[in-house]
Amino acid sequence: MAIKLEDKKAIVAEVNEAAKVALSAVVADARGVTVSAMTGLRKEAREAGVYVRVVRNTLLKRAVEGTEFSILNDAFKGPTLIAFSNEHPGAAARLFKEFAKGQDKFEIKAAAFDGNFIAANQIDVLATLPTRDEAIARLMSVIQGATSKLARTLAAIRDQKEATAA
């Protein structure tokens, strides 16, 4: 089906705007995935703050031109589904990884984060990044552990001095 030039320009502009504000991008091949499964993926993507779109490769190359995601151009072969994470860098990777577990034909091609190309076999690195809240919680537990250890040490020193004084 032929797309009019105005429609192509609108698609390129829309994807370019999404790419400019995105933290990371993940590219996948969704051949053989049912419509109902894709609808479910899109719903989950909206809830996770991820922009998902099926775009022709030539339009996608034009859309990411001049952005940090232009390094993904080599991955734009065959049917391409692209997802941009807007709120958390690992959101799109986590979403696609979970979706791929239930879909045999869904294949993650590559990802990009912070100007770096991430191969499909290394997608776990991006998918397992903690969210901001998780990172803060981990930091707080480390700080809390260190302060409680300091308090126990000071109490032990106090008890030792009291024992030697008596």
Swiss-Prot record:
Belongs to the universal ribosomal protein uL10 family. The keyword Lyase does not apply. InterPro entries: Ribosomal_uL10 (IPR001790), Ribosomal_uL10-like_sf (IPR043141), Ribosomal_uL10_bac (IPR022973), Ribosomal_uL10_bac_type (IPR047865), Ribosomal_uL10_CS_bac (IPR002363). It comes from the Bacteria. This is Large ribosomal subunit protein uL10. Forms part of the ribosomal stalk, playing a central role in the interaction of the ribosome with GTP-bound translation factors. The lineage of its organism: Bacteria, Pseudomonadati, Pseudomonadota, Gammaproteobacteria, Pseudomonadales. The gene is rplJ. Pfam families: Ribosomal_L10. One of its GO terms (cellular component) is large ribosomal subunit. Keywords: Ribonucleoprotein, Ribosomal protein, RNA-binding, rRNA-binding. One of its GO terms (molecular function) is structural constituent of ribosome. GO terms for biological process: translation. Part of the ribosomal stalk of the 50S ribosomal subunit. The N-terminus interacts with L11 and the large rRNA to form the base of the stalk. The C-terminus forms an elongated spine to which L12 dimers bind in a sequential fashion forming a multimeric L10(L12)X complex.
